[in-house]
Amino acid sequence: MLISISLATLPILAFSWASFIEPNWLRTTAIPWRLPKKHAHLHGLRIAQISDLHFHKRVPEKFLNKVSKSIKNFSPDLIVFCGDLLCRARLEDKERLETFLNTLEAPLGVFAILGNHDYSSYISRNTKGEITCIPEEKSRPIQRAIIAVMQGLFSSPSYRYDPNLTPQEPHPDLLKLLKNTPLTLLHNTTHVIPNTLNIVGLGDLFARQFHPEQAFKNYDPSLPGLLLSHNPDGITRLQQYPGDFVLSGHSHGPQVTLSWPKFARKFFERLSGLENPYLARGYFVTKEGKQLYVNRGLGGLKRIRFCSPPEICYITCSYD
C-alpha cells in the first residue's frame, strides 16, 4: 500500500520540481580558454556568457536579480548574450526587460546576437517539420511538440526550410530597446577589441541570416576570435573561417532530459531538433581544433526544466 502511494506521488513530485524548483535553480559553469603564449597578455581575462532568456511577463523578478548578482560577483571583463532575448517574437513588459539589461556591465563591453525568436516573426518548425514563420494564432505548440517528437525519432535531423521563407529582419522594437542598454548588437559583423580579441556575431540559421562571409570581413587574424552563433549547428559551417572559441545556445540542454542511461540521453538529444543532436549541451572540440560551448540558457517557451537547470557560463583565459 505504502509503495503504491509512493509510486503514485513520484510524477507529482517530478512535475512540481520541473515547474517550480529547477527553472529558478541557477547554476554556473566554469570553462578555461587556453591560448597560445603569444597571447599571454590575455591571461586572466574573464568572459560571462548567457543565452536564451526568452523574456516574458511571467519571468520572476527574483530570478532576474539572481542572474544580475551572479554576473556582478564574477566581475567579468566582457559579457556576451547568445540570442533569444524574446519569446515568440513578442516584446512584453519592455520597461522591465530594459531595466534588467541595464544591470549588465563590463569594462570591455556587452555584446549580443539574435536568436530565432528575435526577428520580426517567430521562426521554428511547422506541423510539416519545415522551418518557417509561425504566426501566433497558428502556433499549435502541443501539436508541433508531438510532431517534433516523432520527427526527432524517425526522421533525418537535417534542416528543411519552407521554400517561401525569406531572410527575416531583426525585430524593430527590440533594436530600439537595445539602443537604451549597454548591449551592442553584432549581426553578421566583427567587433575588434584592440590588442585583445575579435568578437564575431552571426545571424540566426533559422532566420536565413547566417552569413559568415559577411561577418568575418573586419576580422583581425593577429588576435584570437570569440564566435557567437545562436544555433550550435553553426559550427559545422564555420570550419573554414578563423576563430578559436564558438559560444552557442538555442537547444536549452534540452530543457527536459536524462543524462543516464545512455539511450535516454540520446533520445532527448534527438528531441532538441538539431542537425547534430549530440551538440545539445556542453563543451566540445572539433577535429580542426575549434572549441564550442553550448549553454543551457536561462529560460524557455515554458518555464519547465528537468535535469537541465538554467545556466551562466564563466570563461577565464589562460595561456599554455
Swiss-Prot record:
Residues the record lists as binding a divalent metal cation 2: D84, N116, H250
Where is the major localization of this protein? Answer: membrane
Looking up NCBIfam families in the UniProt record yields:
lipid_A_LpxG
Which organism is this entry from? Chlamydia pneumoniae
The entry's a divalent metal cation 1-binding residues are D52, H54, D84, H252
Alphabetical list of CDD domains matching this protein:
MPP_YkuE_C (cd07385)
- Its name, as the record gives it, is UDP-2,3-diacylglucosamine pyrophosphatase LpxG
Recite the lineage of the species. Answer: Bacteria, Pseudomonadati, Chlamydiota, Chlamydiia, Chlamydiales
Pathway listed for it? Glycolipid biosynthesis; lipid IV(A) biosynthesis
**Which terms are listed as keywords in the entry?**
Cell inner membrane, Cell membrane, Hydrolase, Manganese, Membrane, Metal-binding, Transmembrane, Transmembrane helix
Catalytic activity line of the entry: UDP-2,3-diacyl-alpha-D-glucosamine + H2O = 2,3-diacyl-alpha-D-glucosaminyl 1-phosphate + UMP + 2 H(+)
Disulphide linkage map: none
Q: What does this protein do?
A: Hydrolyzes the pyrophosphate bond of UDP-2,3-diacylglucosamine to form 2,3-diacylglucosamine 1-phosphate (lipid X) and UMP by catalyzing the attack of water at the alpha-P atom. Involved in the biosynthesis of lipid A, a phosphorylated glycolipid that anchors the lipooligosaccharide (LOS) to the outer membrane of the cell.
Q: How is the cofactor bound?
A: Binds 2 divalent metal cations.
Where in or outside the cell it occurs: the entry states:
Cell inner membrane
Please provide, in alphabetical order, the Gene Ontology terms of the cellular component aspect for this entry. Answer: plasma membrane
Q: What is its EC number?
A: 3.6.1.-
TM ranges are 1-21
Q: Name one Pfam family in it.
A: Metallophos
The protein's required cofactors? Mn(2+)
Extract the PANTHER family matched here: PHOSPHODIESTERASE YAEI (PTHR31302:SF31), TRANSMEMBRANE PROTEIN WITH METALLOPHOSPHOESTERASE DOMAIN-RELATED (PTHR31302)
Q: Which SUPFAM superfamilies match?
A: Metallo-dependent phosphatases (SSF56300)
One GO BP on record is:
lipid A biosynthetic process
